[in-house]
């Protein structure tokens, strides 16, 4: 009986030694080997009309659009575009990044003026699109719908 126990113990230790001597392969690193990380995407925390009473606007007036955004990577510029009714999208402004950190919202803030075209019919929809562009070329877009009253 003692001989069997010693034999089993010896086999157990020998098996453990064989398994620990085997080469351990790294986990599959396909993703790491085949993806180039170029940076992080900017974040748009909010895009609203200021003061925030309504999205109904008068033709011929100027509307202040409040953009709240941030990014872990350096920001290059902010593009503002508009689509009036069924027309083509047009660039309203391109603004170079200027640091404007807000302690209240913990984001950068930017007020973008938008002159609403005069002579628009009541009920015309205006879609505003803002795009934050990082220096690493990654972008984030969001839209805001306005209605002519």
Residue ranges and their predicted role:
Residues 1-4, 19-20, 79, 87-90:
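Compositionally biased, low-complexity segments enriched in small residues
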Residues 2-6, 15-44:
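Bacterial Sec-dependent N-terminal signal peptides
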Residues 8, 17-19, 82, 118:
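Functionally constrained cores in energy, signaling, and assembly domains
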Residues 31-149:
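First exposed extracellular module after export/assembly in secreted or surface-exposed proteins
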């Amino acid at each position: 009986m003692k001989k069997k126990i010693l034999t089993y113990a010896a086999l157990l230790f020998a098996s453990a030694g064989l398994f620990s001597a085997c080469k351990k392969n790294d986990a599959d690193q396909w993703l790491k080997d085949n993806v180039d990380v170029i940076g992080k995407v900017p974040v748009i925390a909010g895009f609203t009309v200021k003061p925030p009473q309504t999205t109904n606007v008068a033709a011929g007036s100027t509307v202040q659009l409040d953009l709240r955004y941030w990014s872990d990577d350096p920001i290059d510029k902010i593009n503002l575009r508009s689509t009036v009714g069924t027309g083509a999208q047009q660039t309203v402004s391109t603004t170079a990044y200027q640091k404007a950190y807000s302690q209240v919202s913990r984001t950068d803030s930017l007020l973008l003026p938008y002159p609403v075209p005069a002579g628009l019919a009541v009920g015309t929809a205006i879609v505003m699109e803002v795009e934050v562009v990082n220096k690493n070329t990654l972008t984030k877009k969001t839209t805001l719908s306005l209605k002519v009253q």
